[in-house]
């Protein structure tokens, strides 16, 4: 029998407090998603079909993190989810949605409803701006067969030149009391659009995680051999791809990673792995970040069904030891129950954490809402559950094409308590991490990693750590018992 090491998880260890002059409110939580993409907070929503679609991804990016849209949908639907995130707000919309004057109001309604926008520029066949159709133009129109050109606000319009700053645009929009400012070139060809909503959101969400064009960042999951899906997602503007597998240290994953890096210019996160060798091989194949975790998730049964995995603290430690030599970020995926677990993962060297169950219960998650015994819940399932595998994630567990009655699941379906908005949950998690860094005297995540010291605790120590000897009469928003 070969016992490689004693393996620990989050509840097995505690960090030792250090002398500190650092206040929690003063720490920086800026980190990295990949070697090229920054995060303003080290939180990622999981690529699960009950956790992340466009609503969760938008909420995460506005707060400074990022969401990874799951792949249990056809390519076109996943591309639409990415597009909704990228179109949700922008400093300057460089490829604005537009409509032609000969289209009907019914056509315009489809566009505005689909993209959740209140107006759309109108152009001719040469792309010249000839008007704008807004809510005010159509509010009292009952005949949707009318042509857009008959109802729109026609030229001359207040427009701006290419290269105008957001501050200049804001002044211009306030001066003329308009909500949309088309950007045109010297020939009056539509080149962009600035909306007052985007300017207001820049003030409301100062830490929003945005790309170079002022759009919210978003990632998307893909499977083995899905190069066509990857290409379409990159064209849609996805910021990072997550090559997602229950066993990231496999020949098919390595081959797919190499093919993507050869053919596309995009950062690729690869996982899941738990060993030094796997981390080294994925980095050699071109991985821009390593996702760590086999079996730590609350809905995952891989360790029980397959007898395979590694407790998450030791897994993170293994992978960071190798990845840090190449300056490749590590993402701790799974096993996070409390904000203290996040702090421990970061102190071990992870650059960010991926969260599933804590976000599955939020308003923005795509899971079903339900009431059970008078309490509110949302559905949550593992991507290795029968339900998720029949919807498209069977390839993640190397069972693609297997009949549903022959699937061997590595996850379950369940429910989690309803927890309000994503922002409420992230607020508590961020606050807990800030508190931890204050105890550690760490001004930033790098200092936390460099200086943190751990002790291994006993089962009695764990019992002492939790609430004990008292009945909770009022639940705390960050402690779940």
Swiss-Prot record:
- Return one GO MF term: nucleotide binding
Active site, UniProt feature: 300 (thioimidate intermediate), 396 (proton acceptor)
Question: EC no.?
Answer: 1.1.1.205
Which GO BP terms sit in this record? Answer: GMP biosynthetic process; GTP biosynthetic process
SMART domains the UniProt entry points to: CBS, IMPDH
What the entry lists under SUPFAM superfamilies is as follows: CBS-domain pair (SSF54631), Inosine monophosphate dehydrogenase (IMPDH) (SSF51412)
Q: Where do the annotations place K(+) binding?
A: 295, 297, 300, 464-466
Q: Which NCBIfam families match?
A: IMP_dehydrog
On subunit structure and binding partners, the annotation says: Homotetramer.
Function summary: Catalyzes the conversion of inosine 5'-phosphate (IMP) to xanthosine 5'-phosphate (XMP), the first committed and rate-limiting step in the de novo synthesis of guanine nucleotides, and therefore plays an important role in the regulation of cell growth.
Name of the protein described by the UniProt record: Inosine-5'-monophosphate dehydrogenase
Q: Which organism is it from?
A: Helicobacter pylori (strain ATCC 700392 / 26695) (Campylobacter pylori)
């Amino acid at each position: 029998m070969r016992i490689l090491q004693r393996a620990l998880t989050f509840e097995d260890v505690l960090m030792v407090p250090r002398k500190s002059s650092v206040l929690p409110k003063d720490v920086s939580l800026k980190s990295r998603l990949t070697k090229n993409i920054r995060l303003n907070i080290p939180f990622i929503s999981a690529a699960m079909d009950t956790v992340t679609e466009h609503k969760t991804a938008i909420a995460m990016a506005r707060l400074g993190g990022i969401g990874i849209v799951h792949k249990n949908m056809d390519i076109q639907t996943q591309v639409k989810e990415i597009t909704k995130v990228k179109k949700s707000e922008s400093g300057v919309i460089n490829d604005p949605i537009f409509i032609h004057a000969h289209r009907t109001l019914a056509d315009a309604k489809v566009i505005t409803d689909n993209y959740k926008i209140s107006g759309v520029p109108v152009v001719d066949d040469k792309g010249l701006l000839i008007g704008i159709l807004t809510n005010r133009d159509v509010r009292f129109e009952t005949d949707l067969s009318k042509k857009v050109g008959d109802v729109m606000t026609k030229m001359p319009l207040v427009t701006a030149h290419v290269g105008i700053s957001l501050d200049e645009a804001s002044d211009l929009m306030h001066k003329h009391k308009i909500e949309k400012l088309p950007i045109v070139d010297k020939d009056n060809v539509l080149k962009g659009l600035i909306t007052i909503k985007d300017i207001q959101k820049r003030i409301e969400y100062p830490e929003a995680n945005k790309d170079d064009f002022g759009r919210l960042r978003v990632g998307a999951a893909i499977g083995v051999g899905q190069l066509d899906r990857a290409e379409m997602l990159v064209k849609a503007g996805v910021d990072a791809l997550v090559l997602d597998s229950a066993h990231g240290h496999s020949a098919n994953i390595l081959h797919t990673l190499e093919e993507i890096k050869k053919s596309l210019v995009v950062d690729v996160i690869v996982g899941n792995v738990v060993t030094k060798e796997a981390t080294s091989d994925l980095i050699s194949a071109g991985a821009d970040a390593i996702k760590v975790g086999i079996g730590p998730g609350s809905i995952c049964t891989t360790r029980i069904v397959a007898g395979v995995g590694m407790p998450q603290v030791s897994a993170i430690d293994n992978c960071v030891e190798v990845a840090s030599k190449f300056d490749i970020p590590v993402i701790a995926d799974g096993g996070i129950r409390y904000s203290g677990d996040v702090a421990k993962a970061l102190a071990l060297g992870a650059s960010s954490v991926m969260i599933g169950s804590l976000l599955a219960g939020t308003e923005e998650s795509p899971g079903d809402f339900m009431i059970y015994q008078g309490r509110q819940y949302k559905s949550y399932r593992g991507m290795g559950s029968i339900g998720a595998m029949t919807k498209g994630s069977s390839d993640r567990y190397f069972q693609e094409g297997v009949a549903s009655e022959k699937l061997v699941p590595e996850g379950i379906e369940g429910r989690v308590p309803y927890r309000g908005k994503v922002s409420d949950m992230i607020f508590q998690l961020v606050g807990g991490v800030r508190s931890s860094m204050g105890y550690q005297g760490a001004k930033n995540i790098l200092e936390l990693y460099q200086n943190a010291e751990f002790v291994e605790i006993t089962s009695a120590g764990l019992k002492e750590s939790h609430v004990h000897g008292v009945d909770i009469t009022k639940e705390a928003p960050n402690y779940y018992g």
